[in-house]
Structure formats: structure tokens, C-alpha cells
A protein has these predicted regions:
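Positively charged n-region of N-terminal signal peptides that target proteins for export
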Residues: 1-4
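Long, contiguous binding/interaction regions
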Residues: 19-121, 128-267, 273-303
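N-terminal signal peptide c-region/cleavage motif recognized by signal peptidases
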Residues: 13-18
């Protein structure tokens, strides 16, 4: 019996050692990028607001807080660090930036829109990679430098950095309807809603809310005429119900796509855009949220 305990103890120790990952060297990441990011539970994210782009959708100004931001997130992995990122690109940026991503040995997992009728047109390119932290930071930095080169300057230092949008919405009323509390930034009231009901992994690494596995909604405008843009994170059996709920409530679905390619379970993302009475839009989002997080045995109402 004693021998069994010893052997079992050794095996457990080896298993823990094999699964152990080191903490991120955030100082090295900051030094390579030249900017300070945000840390969260052992993960780290660099965000670049696209202040050099002046974009409108249906008369509403789209500022970085409405979803116009590039980001690179770092999380510990067995071989050092796994990165995930979302790069905002114009039609002019698209080809040279994707060439740079491939040149750096990173992968492209999605290219898609967030909006329609937006001028100028922008797209979002998701990238990924894993390896030593310093190498991943250098590769991601090279991609961001390519964007700077094409646009002729640092996107974060554009003229839109001081811009705000009109927001006279009753945020407390929205909170009560949606069931979550948002945060205000430059006139944009934004909800970020995680999926704690789903244990998501990419290459056997946990993908958290902070790494982009979330549903979000960004608001601006007035109670009578509000605009809301956002993203739903959905399991495959939730997609049809979420789309149905949004469309039936006057909210336009503008994109359905993936962000990752090796994730388990499979996750789909949906972008939407709504204009109208704020209370009605909030009720529509709540109806769509009710289609997510259901137990496997629950039946989806498609009537």
C-alpha cells in the first residue's frame, strides 16, 4: 500500500509538472510594444484604438469604444505564450497586413466585417500563434508596424482620440432590461458578457472572456433614437435562435463567422447593428441573450 502511494504521488507530480505553465513576462511585452497594456488574472492585452479612422454608420459616429480597436492578447501556454488578436484593417491595409502575418509565421483564423454601410469600409482580421513570449511579442509588433507603415502614422495618435459621442440613455433602465451592468467611455455605454457556462479551449489552452470569448453590446444616442452595435458568442445550437430573436426585434444581423479554427467546443460569432427606441432594442438583445446559455436538453423555440 505504501509503495502504491509513493508511485501515485510520483505520477501526480509528473502530471502537474507537464501541465504547468510559466507566468507571462509582461515587462518584456511592454518593452517590445513600447506601450503599457492591461493585465487580468495572469493574462495580458495590448489595445490600439484606431483614432486615425473617421467612420460613420447610418449617421452615427463609430469611435474606438464602439468596437474600432485592434488588440493582441497574451496567455500562458506550455511552450511559452499563446497569442490571439484582432487587427482592424482598411481595404488598403488588408493585403500587405495579411502578408506580414504570414511572413511572421503567425496564422490567420478569420477576416470579416463588423458593420455594413460604413464609410470608409473596415474589416477585422484575427491572428494567432504560440511560442516564447518575446518572439510572439516581436511578431505581433511587426504586424502592427506594418499597419503604421501603410497608413503613414500611428493609428492611436489620430485626431479621433479626443472624440466623444452623444449619450443621454438611461443606463440604469438598460441594465435592468439586459440584466448586466455596463461601463461608460467617451459617450459609449458598453456591456461585456462572458460565457462561464462554456469551458472553451484553443490548442488545449483555456480561452477566457478577456481573450475575446464574450458577447458585447456598445450603445450611444438618445432614448428615442439609440444605436447599438455588438457581438454574440454562440454555441452551434444557439445560432439560429439568436439570429431569429434579433431579426424579429428589428436588429440587423450583419455578420456570422468564426474567430478561431481549433477551438473546442465550436463557437460562432455574430455581429449586429440596431437603431431605434432604446428600450425596444434592449428588449431585443435580452430576447437574444435568452437563447444562449441553455442546457443541452432545453428546446429552442423556433415558432
Amino acid at each position: 500500500m505504501k509503495t502504491c502511494f509513493v508511485v501515485c504521488g510520483i505520477l501526480l507530480s509528473l502530471l502537474i509538472s507537464a501541465q504547468k505553465v510559466t507566468s507571462l513576462d509582461t515587462l518584456t511585452i511592454e518593452k517590445i510594444f513600447g506601450i503599457k497594456g492591461k493585465a487580468n488574472n495572469g493574462e495580458y492585452k495590448i489595445t490600439i484604438p484606431q483614432n486615425d479612422l473617421s467612420i460613420e454608420v447610418d449617421g452615427f459616429k463609430i469611435i474606438p469604444a464602439m468596437g474600432l480597436g485592434t488588440w493582441i492578447a497574451f496567455t500562458p501556454a506550455k511552450n511559452g505564450t499563446m497569442i490571439m488578436g484582432d487587427i482592424v484593417v482598411t481595404e488598403t491595409d488588408l493585403k500587405p497586413v495579411q502578408q506580414e502575418i504570414i511572413r511572421q509565421g503567425l496564422t490567420i483564423s478569420a477576416i470579416h466585417n463588423h458593420f455594413v454601410r460604413n464609410h470608409p469600409n473596415v474589416m477585422y482580421m484575427h491572428l494567432g500563434g504560440s511560442g516564447p513570449t518575446d518572439q510572439m511579442a516581436q511578431k505581433a509588433k511587426a504586424v502592427l508596424d506594418k499597419v503604421k507603415e501603410i497608413r503613414g502614422g500611428d493609428p492611436s495618435k489620430g485626431t479621433a482620440s479626443s472624440e466623444t459621442v452623444t449619450n443621454t440613455l438611461d443606463s440604469k433602465h438598460l441594465d435592468d432590461i439586459i440584466g448586466y451592468k455596463g461601463e461608460m467611455s467617451k459617450g459609449v455605454y458598453k456591456y461585456t458578457i462572458g460565457r462561464p457556462d462554456v469551458s472553451l479551449k484553443e490548442h488545449d489552452v483555456i480561452v477566457t472572456t478577456f481573450l475575446g470569448f464574450n458577447t458585447w453590446a456598445a450603445w450611444q444616442g438618445t432614448p428615442e433614437k439609440a444605436a447599438v452595435a455588438g457581438d454574440f458568442a454562440m454555441l452551434e445550437n444557439e445560432v439560429a435562435g439568436v439570429i431569429k430573436a434579433l431579426v424579429e426585434n428589428g436588429i440587423e444581423v450583419v455578420a456570422v463567422h468564426n474567430h478561431m479554427v481549433h477551438e473546442q467546443p465550436k463557437i460562432f460569432f455574430l455581429h449586429y447593428w440596431g437603431i431605434g427606441n432604446a428600450e425596444q432594442l434592449a428588449k431585443g438583445l435580452r430576447a437574444a441573450l435568452d437563447q444562449t446559455g441553455k442546457k443541452q436538453g432545453d428546446k429552442m423555440n423556433m415558432n
